[in-house]
Design a protein with these regions (language model features):
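Amphipathic alpha-helical polymerization modules
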Residues: 2-283
Length: 283
């Protein structure tokens, strides 16, 4: 074999190896992407029975195309030789929350509430360090404590309308714990035919300013604007999560297959590279 043929063959092998390594990296990023999607999906399934939980999802985004050149090849007027462009795989583009309304579950409990429409209950949440801040939730499973305050199952205070609109954690709702309560669709609370308070319901102008906190609560980040809600309060019901378990299971199977396909690609490229190094290189 003449020197010119050897040079041509060597260059061809170099170009081929670049695309083989690219195949490895593309498969690797694809597997990482599918693993992240699986983590999100698993969290959705784990919270399928969580009151007011909102489904999360993720979008895929490709890395920017990179210009590939031959390493140390400046034979063309001293300029690097181009191999073309290549995409270096995919990654999670954005994790988003689906705020669509879940189904209502009838409980006939007078302190259980669901919101029909856009909006959130306002909760004065106290963390383990004793710090209190206003959170927003669609979970209306409340109780009346011994002091007569309307609270969540964890004991955090439910805010009235003034507290909800102004993020006033001290604007609590207090009723007579010994009397039954009735609540209309505007959230007005009645005992003995007299209004004793109003459940605070507020909406957010742009949901992109909501950050998930825990399983079914949200923080309003800087720049977020509260606004009046048109949601109707339904007594004796709780909003379930908006998770479709069957659909999520189908997606899990699809993701698992995509992950396995990435494994097969890596194995195939690994075997091919092994032959290139140990067999083709000897020729």
């Amino acid at each position: 074999m003449c020197t010119e043929d050897v040079i041509k063959r060597t260059k061809a092998v170099q170009k081929w190896r670049v695309y083989m390594v690219k195949g490895l990296y593309t498969a690797y990023t694809g597997m990482i992407n599918e693993q992240n999607r699986l983590d999100i999906l698993s969290n959705n399934l784990a919270n399928a029975d969580t009151n007011g939980y909102k489904k999360e999802g993720a979008t895929n985004q490709t890395f920017a195309d990179e210009l590939a050149i031959k390493i140390k090849d400046t034979s063309y007027y001293g300029m690097p030789q181009k191999l073309g462009t290549m995409s270096m795989g995919v990654h999670i583009g954005e994790t988003y929350t689906d705020y669509s309304q879940g189904n209502f579950r009838v409980t006939d409990n007078s302190t259980d509430f669901a919101l029909d429409g856009d909006g959130f209950f306002a909760i004065a949440y106290t963390d383990k360090a004793g710090n209190t801040s206003v959170k927003y939730s669609r979970d209306g499973a409340f109780v009346v404590n011994t002091a007569g305050y309307l609270v969540t199952k964890d004991g955090d205070y439910v805010l009235n309308q003034n507290g909800a609109m102004n993020a006033d954690a001290g604007a609590r709702i207090q009723v007579d714990p010994n009397l039954p309560i009735t609540v209309d669709e505007k959230g007005n609370i009645f005992q003995n035919n007299q209004q004793v308070g109003t459940i605070g319901v507020v909406d957010i102008e742009d949901y992109n300013y909501l950050a998930k906190y825990g399983e079914n609560m949200y923080d309003l980040v800087n720049g977020g604007v509260r606004q009046a809600s048109t949601a109707k309060v339904t007594q004796g019901c709780i909003e379930s999560s908006n998770i479709n378990v069957v659909s999520e299971m189908v997606n899990m199977i699809t993701i698992s297959r995509a992950f396995q396909a990435g494994q097969k690609v890596i194995n195939a490229v690994d075997e091919t590279l092994d032959k290139a190094v140990n067999q083709v290189g000897r020729v």
